[in-house]
């Protein structure tokens, strides 16, 4: 790809548009991502190929995404990979797929675009753009870890006051009760 990204002509450049959510319960967020990705591709006149799926951001369960990156890396021409936001790429800075994509960018074969952040990561990206990408991945990882910590604290709190932290096991009844001052109902 060109050395500078200023006023670049992207017309008909192959673009892999990635809309991803972490699990099936978040699927309602996919249409909004898809719309933003398609609008971005239309604006730049990209030859966009939309991939939309639910798959965790953790490396063991990224079968679809790894396959897309493999296909993109074998693509014979330069290409762009577009994610709505950085955390749709990954929350793990050290993952193999991130390393692969960053190497493709270093070679000048790929660019990573994040339209919601106005970030285009390319071979000649300045230090502040590289840092924005890395910080976005770090903060995505932090967000995920913080949610996990909050869930653990909530479970500990429920157990400390004698509440079961979820539904009863199979074979037991889920009985709701209320506490009114000192009286159990």
Regions from the language model: what does each represent?
Residues 1-157:
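Short, structured surface patches at the beginning of a domain
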Residues 3-6, 145-184:
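Coupling/hinge elements of helicase-like and P-loop NTPase modules
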